[in-house]
Amino acid sequence: MRMRLLFVKDFLDLIFPRNCELCTRALFDYEFCLCTICEGKLPITSYHLRATDNDLKDKLQGLTRVLRVLAFLKFTKNGKSQRLLHQLKYRNKPQVGYYLGKKYGQLLLKQDYSKSWDCIVPVPLHRMKLKRRGYNQSEEFAKGLAESLGIQMENILE
C-alpha cells in the first residue's frame, strides 16, 4: 500500500510539480511554498523583539493611539514580500498566506507571544472580492498563525 501511495505522489509531482513561490525551483518533500534558500532570504523584521519601540510604531503613532506594533516582513516594492503577497492575492495561492502565518507564529512562539492573545481575528474581505477570489487572504494567514500559536481563530468581524 505504501509503495502505491509513493507512486501516486511521484506521479502527481510529475504532472503538478511543487515549486518555490519565489524562485520556482522544485521543492523537496520537507519544503512547503518556499525553498530553504528563499525562506532564508525573507526580509523578516525584528519588530516582535521590540513591539513597543520600532520605526513602524513611530509612523503609526501620529495617526492613532498605538501600544505595540508587530510586522513579520519588511515590504519593499518589487521585493520578496511584495511578490509573495501578489501570489497570495492575485495568483490564487491561499497556501502562501497559511505558510506565512505559520512561519510568523513559529517566530512569535520563541518570544512567548502565545499567552498574549485570546484569539486571532482575520480582517474581513468585501463579499464581492471574496466571491471573485474564492478565499480571504487575511483568513489564510490567520489560520497558519493561530495553528502555530495554539490559539483559536475566530471570524467575529463583518
Predicted segments with their positions:
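Glycine-rich phosphate/pyrophosphate-handling loop used in enzymes and phosphotransfer proteins
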Residues: 1-158
